[in-house]
Amino acid sequence: MSDQTLSNLSREERRFEPPAELAAHANVKEEAYARADSDREAFWAEAAERLDWGQKWDQVLDWSNPPFAKWFVGATINAAVNCVDRHVAAGNGDKVALHWVGEPLHEGVADTRDVTYADLKDLVSKAANALTDLGVKKGDRVAIYMPMIPEVVVAMLACARLGAPHTVVFGGFSADALASRITDCEAHVVITSDGGYRRGAASALKPAVDEAVAKTGDLVRNVLVVRRTGQDLGEGGWNAERDVWWHDVVDSASADHEPEMHDSEHPLYVMYTSGTTGTPTGILHTTGGYLTGTSYTHWAVFDLKDDDVYWCTADVGWVTGHSYLTYGPLGNGATQVMYEGTPERGRWWQIIQDYKVSIFYTAPTAIRTFMKQGREIPDGYDLSSLRLLGSVGEPINPEAYIWYREVIGGERCPIVDTWWQTETGQILISPLPGVTAGKPGSAMKALPGTAIDVVNDEAQSVGEGNGGYLVIREPWPAMLRTLWGDDQRFKDTYWSRWEGLYFAGDGAKLDEDGDIWLLGRVDDVMNISGHRLSTTEIESALVSHPKVAEAAVVGAADETTGQAVCAFVILRESAGDGGPDIVEELRKHVAHEIGAIAKPRQIMVVPELPKTRSGKIMRRLLKDVAEHREVGDVTTLADSAVMDLIKGKEGAASAED
């Protein structure tokens, strides 16, 4: 958090007032802030009343044993009932829940399905019955490793219906990453598909599941497989004693399923994220508070109306796909688009035009990609249905904000730049579209009912015009309850820096207006295309290669992905110079160990790494090199000449095309 960065941010003077029509009919008005401040618990109790409960709560919040929160104590609820059944019961069974758009199968023709709420209720009930027949009981964990097809939402809701916490693993992660997550949460059933489509080509998923399951001993009892691509699973690709086709057991199951109401604090899902230790961190979210937080913020931040068509482009393997594709929108009975593919030129704008999307929620990485392609592409489509735009995953720079507003939003759509985390479960900082004037690059203000602050090293509020650490002072409904199986690590990771404060790991600044600017991670977790990856985990993957002795990884600024992985490696003496293909070899190795998203953009083979006398690697100096800056203060290094050696190698560094 340099002084230069902080001072630059305060110069943004452009403002965009809420459209008058939107402001007049906004779901949430200015008075919500004062109402929430006067009685936070009453505010969230009112938000919880938007849901259907089996039994009402005796106590809104139990914070008697911090940092372990309990929300809506004594209440019972079922997430699937709130996302599906209650909308059918209210007479909205014919309303489309999902406009699903698959990858184009051939030029100009896409695989599409419309799933109504009545359809979804039947599918979820059938899947719940099928899982019960496979021995899944309340409390059992189920791993899900699937492409972006309707069945992944069905699988999640079927698990929620049964009270079986799901752990969804991003389909781009490796077999090793999947195995570690299956093992950590002790999942006995894995739901997957034969494959998915990416950029028009079939991509296999089942082989990675087979490899992962083989690493977990006899832990996994069944693998339930959706036929998506119809591709040949190959010799040994089907275990008749373990593997079950979805269409064999789900399609034939009964559509009648009596749901059980679960305790408000019953585990809903475990979401794994790369933590600073390099080992997967299982974030536990429970049911009542999480549903309250996600459904309310989806309704408030996106100003959702009955006739809106909403589209969140996130993959369901990430938390945004949980909170703002599955539980938030479906909890609110929204109609939404779900897309299997990647953002090819013009494809997204075609979908917005075809389905008359009115609310669009995507990441700055995608926006910057479209900027590079040129405005003539979106200009060729009718985007007049859009009325609100959202941004998620990382701070959006002012230039991208303006382009997004002008080119995609036609200079009429408010932008909600949202800040939240896997851990927070729900959006915590965002403009309210009918209340807040938008300021390019700023996430603006904490939402009603949340207590955000920016503090210095002594946990004192820094005040307007200053930067510091982003913290949360009071509990919120969708907050993580703990780390799966490790309460102590939960306390150490999030609550140990300052007593009573949740430290988000992000730096932030309050500008002269008191608006919040996010400055990115202050620890060693990188933000690549809106996805959090641990430098430690990537370093571990590099060092596991037989030619590598030591590695250091930094996140360097990248105009497209926000940050890019840059690695510095010392080879083993036996490896010599590693050979001409060493860089590509190491990239492929990281992709195999973790996933393609973690593949370094740049790898530099160096003779030594900059270390302090205590042996700590000075990553900030490596970041200077990766970002082509003048190297900073080297006085604390054990050998300051090391940086001259590394700088000497800079011209020979190999970067990804």
Which residue ranges define each predicted feature?
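Conserved ATP/PPi-binding loop(s) of AMP-dependent carboxylate-activating enzymes
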Residues: 445-449, 460-494, 533, 630-631
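Structural core segment of the AMP-binding/adenylate-forming
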Residues: 157, 161-248, 363-364
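Conserved AMP-binding/adenylate-forming core of the ANL superfamily
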Residues: 80, 98-157, 174-179, 242-248, ...
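Conserved AMP-binding/adenylation subdomain of ANL enzymes
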Residues: 291-309, 317-358, 373-376
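Gly/Ser/Thr-rich phosphate-binding loop
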Residues: 247, 357-362, 371-438, 451
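AMP-binding/adenylate-forming catalytic core of the ANL superfamily
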Residues: 169-194, 209, 353, 360, ...
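Conserved pre-ATP/AMP-binding loop-to-beta segment of ANL
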Residues: 96, 223-226, 237-272, 279, ...
